[in-house]
């Protein structure tokens, strides 16, 4: 792709992500934990982003369909979850993102959200990708933990063949033996060469899959470390799950950062990003 071609994705009619655009944060609790809590978290995160000049998309899941154990909390379900996300969108004026797990969910979810997210485990599911593409919404695809960054070209081709125009690709760590992930930061420029803005998922990258036996564990203390490294390599957006009290969260608490730590973390990332403000690419 020629260097004169701008790499951007539109988030509805709100803003763009990519070349020449401010950093965007995809942030919020892992799973929807209630209406009032979602509104409170969205408003609090939005205020931090406003102070720092960061574009903000609220994210939260209506269903965590791939929890480690059958007894883990999955969420409020499609209907109630979308109602809560729609309230965040309309009352706070924020764009929203959530993930879909089945093809038949795409059209319904797209009526509410601004960005459809394809989970990493499902990123090669052709029917799911085509259903998401058909909605006309922006699509964020998480690279599978088992997939090479250059193999994401096939995912991008499926979505483009399906009519998707605004695509984002997310790095969230790669399998490193059992119960461990490692981040290969080469994936960011390599995926960006596919013509899509790139996102770094700083919180799932510190996950320890199945590390607590019947649930995943994590090392949230390394979230700022990896986020700064990603900013140095070059990112268009940052994905971070955020909670008022992660130790009491209903899903992925060990990976999530505390709301109280968000502003300081973002300030560090912005300073790094500004210091290395050059085009992102893998070419020498």
Swiss-Prot record:
Its EC number is 2.5.1.55. It catalyses: D-arabinose 5-phosphate + phosphoenolpyruvate + H2O = 3-deoxy-alpha-D-manno-2-octulosonate-8-phosphate + phosphate. GO terms for cellular component: cytoplasm. The keyword Transferase applies. GO terms for biological process: keto-3-deoxy-D-manno-octulosonic acid biosynthetic process. Gene3D superfamilies: Aldolase class I (3.20.20.70). SUPFAM superfamilies: Aldolase. Keywords: Cytoplasm, Lipopolysaccharide biosynthesis, Transferase. It is an enzyme of class 2 (transferase). GO terms for molecular function: 3-deoxy-8-phosphooctulonate synthase activity. The keyword Manganese does not apply. Pathway: Carbohydrate biosynthesis; 3-deoxy-D-manno-octulosonate biosynthesis; 3-deoxy-D-manno-octulosonate from D-ribulose 5-phosphate: step 2/3; Bacterial outer membrane biogenesis; lipopolysaccharide biosynthesis. It is found in: Cytoplasm. Belongs to the KdsA family. HAMAP family: KDO8P_synth. NCBIfam families: KDO8P_synth, PRK05198.1. This is 2-dehydro-3-deoxyphosphooctonate aldolase. It comes from Synechococcus elongatus (strain ATCC 33912 / PCC 7942 / FACHB-805) (Anacystis nidulans R2).
């Amino acid at each position: 792709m020629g260097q004169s071609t701008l790499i951007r994705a539109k988030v509805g009619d709100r803003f763009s992500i990519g070349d020449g655009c401010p950093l965007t944060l995809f942030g919020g609790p892992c799973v929807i934990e209630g209406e009032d809590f979602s509104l409170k978290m969205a408003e609090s995160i939005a205020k931090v982003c406003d102070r720092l000049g960061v574009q903000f998309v609220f994210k939260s899941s209506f269903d965590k369909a791939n929890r480690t154990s059958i007894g883990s909390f999955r969420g409020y379900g499609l209907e109630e979850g979308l109602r809560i996300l729609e309230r965040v969108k309309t009352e706070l004026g924020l764009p929203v993102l959530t993930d879909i797990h089945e093809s038949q969910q795409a059209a319904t979810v797209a009526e509410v959200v601004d960005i459809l997210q394809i989970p990493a485990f499902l990123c090669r599911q052709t029917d799911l990708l085509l259903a998401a593409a058909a909605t006309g919404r922006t699509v964020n695809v998480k690279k599978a933990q088992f997939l090479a960054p250059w193999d994401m070209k096939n995912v991008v081709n499926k979505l483009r063949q399906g009519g998707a125009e605004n695509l984002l690709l997310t790095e969230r760590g790669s399998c490193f033996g059992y119960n461990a992930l490692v981040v290969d930061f080469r994936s960011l420029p390599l995926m960006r060469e596919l013509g899509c803005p790139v996102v770094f998922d700083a919180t799932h990258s510190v996950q320890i899959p199945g590390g607590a036996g019947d649930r995943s564990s994590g090392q949230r203390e390394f979230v700022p470390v990896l986020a700064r490294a990603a900013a140095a390599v070059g990112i268009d957006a940052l994905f971070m799950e955020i909670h008022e009290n992660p130790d009491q969260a209903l899903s992925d608490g060990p990976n999530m950062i505390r709301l109280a730590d968000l502003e300081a973390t973002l300030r560090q990332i912005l300073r790094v990003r500004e210091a290395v403000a050059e085009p992102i690419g893998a070419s020498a």
